A protein has these predicted regions:
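Charged/polar low-complexity intrinsically disordered segments, enriched in acidic residues
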Residues: 12, 16-23
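Short, charge-rich amphipathic interface segments used for partner binding and complex assembly
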Residues: 21-63
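Short, charge/polar-rich alpha-helical segments
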Residues: 1-14
């Protein structure tokens, strides 16, 4: 993996972290209906899983 590809993946990880943080803040505000909060919690979990998968790819490719 070249450095440009690595930077692209690291940027994606950062973007996912920012999105997950924004979603978590919205869930914590508790201003939405329960069904919407449940959906947002699911989105947050999916974002976290995606971040972990990308981090694993980066780790494997930089060995």
């Amino acid at each position: 993996m070249n450095e440009r590809d690595l930077l692209t993946l690291e940027s994606a990880v950062t973007a996912i972290e920012e999105a997950a943080t924004a979603v978590a803040r919205e869930v914590e505000r508790d201003r939405l209906r329960e069904t919407s909060l449940t959906r947002l919690s699911t989105v947050e979990a999916e974002l976290i899983r995606s971040r972990l998968a990308l981090e694993k790819i980066i780790q494997e490719e930089t060995r």
